[in-house]
């Protein structure tokens, strides 16, 4: 009987010693630890993703110099505005650099200095010699490319804002106007050259015409007709005879 009791006690102790260990004592590399690592990695990835999204919603502040760009250069113009040929004028030019000189060599505002002007005039005289055929202009005019034109009058006589710089396809173009005006209202003491001062009063004056230019209307760019100087003409009137 006592032998049977000892046998049962030994079998019970062996059963307890051979029981499975708890998950708290699971060795590294076991499935329980792998699940925990995966969960921790997922939480870390989620934290990084949340931080990245937060950075996107709250970007870093821009530099002051980036915020102080010219208002005209920041206005992006739709390229479709330039697809219609009826909006183009030979006296309006959009360019990234100053236009070339006019044929009469009087558009000197874009030249570097007086020496450059003299060299250009001498070169032109050598290439195209001028022959004195007795032909003179009634009025002396000067033609120049005008830059930085900001104000003008439209076809209704109202003042409008002219765009100086145009942002087109990430390139900044300047709007130039080719204007012609009188050099002197009285090229000769009597008025216009070649006019009979005994019977006529005369003087030279600048006339204007309308060209399509890119203007600002609210916060949008639009085409409008504006006045610019385009010619110098002679105005005459008959003298009254005193009897």
From Swiss-Prot:
Query: Per the UniProt entry, what is one GO biological process?
Result: negative regulation of neuron apoptotic process
Q: Which ranges are cleaved off as propeptide?
A: 19-125
**What does the tissue specificity note say?**
Expressed by the venom gland.
Annotated region (Disordered), positions in chain: 48-69
A Pfam family (short name) is NGF
Signal peptide: which range, if any? 1-18
Supply the InterPro entries for this chain: Cystine-knot_cytokine, Nerve_growth_factor-like, Nerve_growth_factor-rel, Nerve_growth_factor_bsu, Nerve_growth_factor_CS, Venom_nerve_growth_factor
Q: Which GO terms describe its molecular function?
A: growth factor activity; lipid binding; metalloendopeptidase inhibitor activity; nerve growth factor receptor binding; toxin activity
- Where are the disulfide bridges? 139-204, 182-232, 192-234
Give the keywords, sorted: Cleavage on pair of basic residues, Disulfide bond, Glycoprotein, Growth factor, Lipid-binding, Metalloenzyme inhibitor, Metalloprotease inhibitor, Protease inhibitor, Secreted, Signal, Toxin
Biased composition of type Basic and acidic residues is found at 48-66
| Disulfide bond among keywords | yes
Q: Which SMART domains match?
A: NGF
Would the keyword GTP-binding be found if you checked this record's keyword annotation? no
Family of the protein in this entry: Belongs to the NGF-beta family.
Cite the PANTHER family for this sequence: BETA-NERVE GROWTH FACTOR, NERVE GROWTH FACTOR NGF -RELATED
Name listed for the protein in its UniProt record: Venom nerve growth factor 2
Q: Which species is this record about?
A: Oxyuranus microlepidotus
For this protein's source organism, the top of the classification is:
Eukaryota, Metazoa, Chordata, Craniata, Vertebrata
């Amino acid at each position: 009987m006592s032998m049977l009791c000892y046998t049962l006690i030994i079998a019970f102790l062996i059963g307890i010693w051979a029981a499975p260990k708890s998950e708290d004592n699971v060795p590294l590399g076991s499935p329980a630890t792998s699940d925990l690592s995966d969960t921790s990695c997922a939480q870390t990835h989620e934290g990084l993703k949340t931080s990245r999204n937060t950075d996107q919603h709250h970007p870093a502040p821009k530099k002051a110099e980036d915020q102080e760009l010219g208002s005209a250069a920041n206005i992006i113009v739709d390229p479709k505005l330039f697809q219609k040929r009826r909006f183009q004028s030979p006296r309006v030019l959009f360019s990234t650099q100053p236009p070339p000189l006019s044929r009469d060599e009087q558009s000197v505002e874009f030249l570097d200095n007086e020496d450059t002007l003299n060299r250009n005039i001498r070169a032109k005289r050598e290439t195209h010699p001028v022959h004195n055929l007795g032909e003179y202009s009634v009025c002396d005019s000067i033609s120049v490319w005008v830059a930085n034109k900001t104000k003008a009058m439209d076809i209704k006589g109202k003042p409008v804002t002219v765009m100086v710089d145009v942002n087109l396809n990430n390139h900044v173009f300047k709007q130039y106007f080719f204007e012609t005006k009188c050099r002197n209202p009285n090229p000769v003491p009597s008025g216009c050259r070649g006019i009979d001062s005994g019977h006529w009063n005369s003087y030279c004056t600048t006339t204007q015409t309308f060209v399509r230019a890119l203007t600002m209307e609210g916060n949008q760019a639009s085409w409008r007709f504006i006045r610019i100087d385009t010619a110098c003409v002679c105005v005459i009137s008959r003298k009254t005879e005193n009897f």
